[in-house]
Amino acid sequence: FYKNQYLYALTYNQGNAGTTRSYIMDSNNEVKARSGEFAVKRFTTYGIYDKYIMTSSTGDGPTAYADENGYLPKMFLLSYLDVSAETFTTNDTQNKAYMSENFLGNGEYVTLAGILERNNKLYSAAIPMGLSQYGSATDGGKWILPGNEDLVKTEDGGSNSSSYKKGELQWTQYPNKCWVAIFDDETLTNKKIIETDKISYACGRFKSQYYQTIWAADNGDIYVFSPSYAKTMADKRQQTTLDAGVVRIKAGTEEFDPDYYYSIEAQTGGKSFIRCWHITGDYFLLLMYDRPLTETGFTANQLAIYKGETGKLTYVTGLPSADLISGFGNTPYVENGYAYMAVTTTEGYPSIYKIDPVGAVATKGVSIEATQISGVGKLQPQN
């Protein structure tokens, strides 16, 4: 949803471009498709900046930038949907400003997670992805940390979002750091990068999607959440030792607050989360896993409220039993300080729950005769 005006069906088509179109509510309160259809590039994250719905992923750059081995550098691949003009544009990867290689100064390429507009700037978590073929081969392998030589792939393999090529060092060598990129505007061509060693990289992960976990409170403070997903890495050298936790960028600054850090796991018996959203004030809604990421079979079937100023996490009461919940909506709808979340269970029809963040209490609302509800939002009639 773009505000209360437009509903966009962002289609993700197994890594390829998918057809995207938008909808409005007319003066007769009927939802109507708009005329434009767009083939949006594959994307791993998305968000709203100014008049645009933006999508981003990282992929191969142009052949003009290939190295002596023919390896292509990784570049940011951006799409811009101008919601009012109903136009679609993409970035020019001939511009080296979109180079994702060595983005953090450690040789690794990154992908972006989340698009947050604050004070006309664009904040995004920069997620280190390891060394591409291009990065691994640079200057005879200077970016490969001593003792990590055996992490470089000796053949092609993997599948889907975990596929890799011979010569890559897949996944980051720096799991105990978090970076945030602060861009001047939606072009992403001018940036400042800040880092902290209090948390691991800031995003939730599911297949090829990198979920936004960087959000602003109403007072302008920006909270950066890390689920510590690197705990799931197979090799100990690439596993984070840091708890899922939260750091902050105070309003009016572009640095991490040195006096702010809270552990999520210390309040949950070691359990983490996959997604989070801002509700109101400094209250945030977290979609929690049922067990630590160091165990197998974890699933996200609980909700919790995090209060930024105190760092306190409180599980939401009033929801169906966690063992009956089979899914939640992709994103909540927020209005007048409450969050409205779709909840699907194995018994009965899915329902919308109203969540009071102050009391961390959910109240059941309308049920829908359907198998599941992927989301909930609100459209105002447009002339």
Predicted regions: what they are:
Residues T20-D26, G70-T87, T138-T189, R237-E254, ...:
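Beta-propeller blade signature
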